[in-house]
Structures are given as C-alpha cells and as structure tokens.
UniProtKB/Swiss-Prot annotation:
Protein name: UDP-glycosyltransferase 79B11
UniProt-listed Gene3D superfamilies: Glycogen Phosphorylase B (3.40.50.2000)
Binding positions (UDP-alpha-D-glucose): 260, 319-325, 340-348, 362-365
Top-level taxon: Eukaryota
Gene: UGT79B11
Disulphide bonds in the chain: none
UniProt organism field: Arabidopsis thaliana (Mouse-ear cress)
C-alpha cells in the first residue's frame, strides 16, 4: 500500500459532471485519500449533502468571472439554455488563475478534470499529475476521435457499425454545434496532454470502445464503473407521490424525465404529452416548461388536463432534484422509463426493472442510445423525422412496443435487460471497478514520484 494522495477535482460546471466526480471523491476519501473539490460557489450548496466524508473532501469555491453573454448569476449549465453554454465555457477558462493559485498553495499530487483542456499544461509546470476523467459515454469519445466524417459511416478502426449518427440525428448535432468545435478541441487536447485517462463506465457496456480509445491515444484507460450513489434510505419518496403511484397496477405507470438541460419547443412538448396520453396508460412526466412558457400548466395541450385527470400528471418541479429519479423508478407501479439517455439516467434505467424508451436530444445521448438499443438490445428508441421532430404516434408506438404484454419486441428487450442487470448487479462487480481504480491510481501516482 502506497502513500495517501491529495487529489484536486475540477469538473465541468454541470451537475451531471460534478455529481459523479463527487461520488468518486467519496470513494477516494473512504480509502483515506484527500480531495479538494473546485466548483462554483452556488453549486456547493446543492452538493454538500452528497459529501459523505467532509473531513476528507474540502470544497474550494470559485468566483465565476463575468462574461458578456452569460446571464448575471449563472454559474452552472442548469442555469442557462444550451445555446449559452459557450459563454459558460469561457467563464470556466477565466478561472485558470484561481486554479493555479490553489495548486500552488495546496500542492496536490493529482488533478482530475474533463473540459478544462489547459489543466495538463499548467499541472505539468507545477509538477502535478493530471487525469482526464470522462463522465460521459466512452462511445462518444471513440466516435469523435475522427471528426467530420460522413453520417452513418464508421470512422477508421471504430469498433461498431451501429453506434453511429444518422441523417435524422442532424438536429442533435446542430443543437450543440455552436459549442461542438470548442468541445472537440477541448476534449482531444485534454486527452493528448494528460498523464492518465479514466472513464465512468465498465467493460460490460463499453469495453470495446474503451479499448479503441486506449489504442488511439497509447495510454492506459482506467474504468471507474458507473459511480452510482448509495440509496439514501433516510429520504424515501414523498408520501403524496408514493400513494399516487400505488393507486395503479404493478408495472403499469410510464415515467418520463428528460433531464435538467432539455427544454423542448412548445409544439414538441405538447406532442410529447399527447404521445404519452395516447398510450392509455397512467403516467408521470417530469420536464422543464417549454421554450416561451413560464409554467407547465400554460403550455399543456387544450383539454389535456381534463382528459387525463386521475391517471396522468405533468410536473415541472423535480428536474433539479435527480436524486428523486431512482426512487420513482424503484416504485413497483412504475413499469416504463422514457428518458433522454443522459449517461446518469442510462445507468439508473439499467439498474431498474423498468422497460426503457429513449428520446436522445444531444449528440452523446444519440450514440449511447444506439449502444443500448442496437448493440445491447435492452431498450427502444423513438424514431424521429429528418427534421428531428418526433410524433405522438411514434412515441406512443415505442412505449407500447414494450408495454404490450404480447409484444415480441417487448418480451425480448425485457429478457435482455434482465440478463444485463443481473450481470451488473452481481456482488462486487461495480464496486470492484471503483476499488481497482483507486488502487491503480494510488500506485500510478506513487510510481511517478510526485507525492508531496
């Protein structure tokens, strides 16, 4: 056993990144290592309750500089629409002096980062090791190693003919296009210059994509597993929702959640509501109000609330509380999960007993959906038109292809999902990834002689 290390963590300013970083920080602290977590001041309040080792993990709040185009007070991705993410990335770059000062004062042995591509250069100058820890899918990294390829055509050496973009995915690529070139530069620069690469995944899901990344960058790729938090048994699902769900039959309720960054156009939001209504099943939808609307209520289709009264609810107040999602998925009445296939939601769906329907919105979500739907065959994807629009009929059809007891597709998907979940839930598998990662990291840092 080597010396204990002091690790800095500096993730992208989005809760979908900061949260798994903190879960990994908890694992490091559990093993006796020290963690300094660099994050925006406002984010600290929302993450403090997930710090299980406050004596081992110290939050280091950052002042987010003013940037023209970034709304006053915005410090995380959930504070802004996707179109403004580029300004948040500029603000992150402007914290460089604060990061450098913290490293100089606290002398860590290692800094983990993802989108701050300048970290390796700075860390090297200060004799600190750097690790790019990617919390999104390995598939999206592997695919984008060769940019600018033809849609539907695998890049050279890419290990899949299924996890690809297609013509009707242009909406997802265009949605993020303003940030995409910057993102690609950031990520590839970080991958090339860092000392170590680690990814929040496991071989059972993305092994061949991790091998491809390793072969391209000639660096060992360490896997942490999904970094799912331990269930907080002290905070069960609120009684009003538990009782409401319990009023329906086992496995009959459709739960839909599209993440804190997804804001649909009003007409697409209404089509989502109508599509779920069309199934005839009880449902619970947790989404943000659509563009141009202040509340969910004002944007609902005409007559919708009256038609679904007693069997359906569309709610807009949970999207900032992702810890509720696994509690809902675990309720025995919930039988189907409609999701955007964010990487955290993907793992939560896999570890549930629900049938899984994906409506990917952003580029990495599209590729992860293809792995789940076409490689592993544990879910279905809602088909979109060339414009990116999905119809109520396609949404309803996707849900019912899984929820109809006589559906051959539904039964096959359920068997595949059950088998994969059994593998992932086998004793020690996922915790083994984390334990191995921590031990390997400790050895790597000690071997390099940078322990302070």
């Amino acid at each position: 056993m080597g010396q204990k290390i002091h690790a800095f963590m500096f993730p992208w300013f989005a809760f979908g990144h900061m949260t798994p970083y903190l879960h990994l920080g908890n694992k490091l602290a559990e093993k006796g290592h020290r963690v300094t977590f660099l994050l925006p001041k406002k984010a600290q309040k929302q993450l403090e309750h997930q710090n299980l080792f406050p004596h081992g993990i110290v939050f280091h709040p950052l002042v987010i500089p003013h940037v023209d185009g970034l709304p006053a007070g915005a410090e995380t991705a959930s504070d802004i629409p996707i179109s403004l993410v580029k300004f948040l990335s500029i603000a992150m770059d402007l914290t460089r002096d604060q990061i450098e000062a913290a490293i100089g004062a606290l002398r860590p042995d290692l800094i983990l980062f993802d989108l701050a591509h300048w970290v390796p250069e700075m860390a090297k100058a200060l004799k600190v090791k750097s690790m790019l820890y990617n919390v999104m899918s390995a598939t999206s990294i592997a695919h984008d190693l060769v940019p600018g390829g033809e849609l539907g055509v695998a890049p050279p050496g890419y290990p899949s003919s299924k996890a690809l973009y297609r013509e009707h995915d242009a909406h997802a690529l265009l949605t993020f296009s303003g940030f995409y070139k910057r993102f690609y530069h950031r990520f590839t620069t970080g991958l090339m210059n860092c000392d170590f690469i680690s990814i929040r995944t496991c071989e059972e899901i993305e092994g061949k994509f991790c091998d491809y990344i390793e072969s391209q960058y000639k660096k060992k790729v360490l896997l942490t597993g999904p970094m799912l938090p331990e269930p907080d048994k002290s905070k069960p699902l609120e009684d009003q929702w538990s009782h409401w769900l319990s009023g329906f039959g086992q496995g009959s309720v459709v739960f839909c959640a599209l993440g804190s960054q997804t804001i649909l156009e009003k007409n697409q939001f209404q089509e989502l509501c109508l599509g779920i209504e069309l199934t005839g099943l009880p449902f619970l939808v947790a989404v943000k109000p659509p563009k141009g609307a202040n509340t969910i209520h004002e944007a609902l289709p005409e007559g919708f609330e009256e038609r679904v009264k007693g069997r359906g609810i569309v709610w807009g107040e949970w999207v900032q509380q992702p810890s509720w999602q696994p509690l809902i998925l675990a309720h025995p009445s919930v039988g189907c999960f409609v999701s955007h296939c964010g990487f955290g939601s993907m793992w939560e769906s896999l570890m549930s007993d629900c049938q899984i329907v994906f409506i990917p919105v952003l580029n990495d979500q599209v590729l992860t959906t293809r792995v789940m739907t076409e490689e592993l065959e544990v879910s279905v994807e809602v088909q979109r038109e060339e414009t990116g629009w999905f119809s109520k009929e396609n949404l309803s059809g996707a849900i019912m292809s899984l929820m109809d007891q006589d559906s051959e597709i539904g039964n096959q998907v359920r068997r595949n999902h059950s088998k994969l979940k059994e593998t992932l839930a086998s004793p020690g598998l996922l915790t083994g990834y984390t334990d191995k990662f921590v031990d390997t990291l400790e050895n790597l840092v000690n071997e390099q002689g940078y322990i302070s």
